[in-house]
Curated annotation (Swiss-Prot):
It comes from the Bacteria. Residues 13-229 form the ABC transporter domain. The gene is ssuB2. This is Aliphatic sulfonates import ATP-binding protein SsuB 2. Belongs to the ABC transporter superfamily. Aliphatic sulfonates importer (TC 3.A.1.17.2) family. The keyword Translocase applies. GO terms for cellular component: plasma membrane. It comes from Rhodococcus jostii (strain RHA1). It is a peripheral membrane protein. GO terms for molecular function: ATP binding; ATP hydrolysis activity. PANTHER family: ALIPHATIC SULFONATES IMPORT ATP-BINDING PROTEIN SSUB, TAURINE IMPORT ATP-BINDING PROTEIN-RELATED. It catalyses: ATP + H2O + aliphatic sulfonate-[sulfonate-binding protein]Side 1 = ADP + phosphate + aliphatic sulfonateSide 2 + [sulfonate-binding protein]Side 1. Its EC number is 7.6.2.14.
Length: 244
């Protein structure tokens, strides 16, 4: 029933028979995917499974890939955040957020920084910020453009555990306010279950697991249904979980 419901809803992302390869290696193998408007999808997979390749294809950043085929339909308004915040070190924080926004940029950028808890840091240099603060700036830069599709490639992977928890809460609040469609690439199964409406597992260029996470938020690790999803997803990743 969940699969049918996904097909009936308007799709923000539609992928058909997507192929991406490097040399003799096929990374994405005739992959199909629909993501409805406003859905938060987390993408799991082993290293080399094609997660970042798919995200880069959706972002239009893989124009130099030789082995390619299939079709992609995505909104024009797309923003991307990476594990590395990719702030320009020669620009102050506000200028990083507002780059390319035009005359209304200053007020919009200041509001976006306030939204991520960095009011008053507009004139700071990126080097003066902690890793968590830099990722907050990256989120502000992405969402100030009001994207219809937000792509995030392990944006919290380099942060400590406490900062990650805080960033999870911030991301959920920002998504609630701005309501983009989201694709989050992560290696963290618990992060995927805690945040997403739907979790995919990519293996050998194909989606092998597609789960709707129907647990009310906030989601607790100790919840029995959380454990069931965790066991299923870890199993798909080749990790055995001891019975409880």
């Amino acid at each position: 029933m969940a699969q049918d419901a996904r097909r009936l809803e308007p799709a923000a992302v539609q992928v058909r028979s997507l192929v991406r390869g490097f040399g003799d290696k096929t990374v994405l193998d005739r992959l199909d995917l629909d993501i409805p408007e406003g859905q938060f999808v987390a993408l799991l997979g082993k290293s080399g499974s094609g997660k970042s390749t798919l995200l880069r294809a959706l972002a239009g950043l893989d124009y130099d890939v030789e082995g390619r085929g299939g079709t992609l339909t995505v909104p024009e308004e797309v923003s991307v955040a990476f594990q590395d915040s990719r702030l320009l070190p020669w620009l102050k924080v506000l200028d990083n957020v507002t780059l390319g926004l035009g005359r209304t940029g200053t007020s919009r950028g200041a509001a976006a920084l306030a939204e991520v808890g960095l009011a008053g840091r507009e004139k700071a240099w990126p080097s003066e910020l902690s890793g968590g603060e830099q990722q907050r700036v990256a989120l502000a830069r992405a969402l100030v453009r009001e994207p219809r599709l937000f792509l995030a490639d392990e944006p919290f992977g380099a942060l400590d555990a406490l900062t990650r928890i805080k960033m999870h809460a911030l991301l959920q609040e920002l998504i609630r306010r701005h309501r983009p469609t989201v694709l989050l690439v992560t290696h963290d199964v618990d992060e995927a279950i805690a945040l997403a409406d739907r979790v995919l597992v990519l293996d050998r260029g194909q989606i092998v697991v597609d789960e709707i996470i129907d647990i009310p938020k906030p989601r607790a690790l100790g919840d029995s249904k959380f454990h069931e999803f965790r066991t299923t997803l870890l199993g798909a990743l080749g990790v055995e979980v001891a019975a409880q």
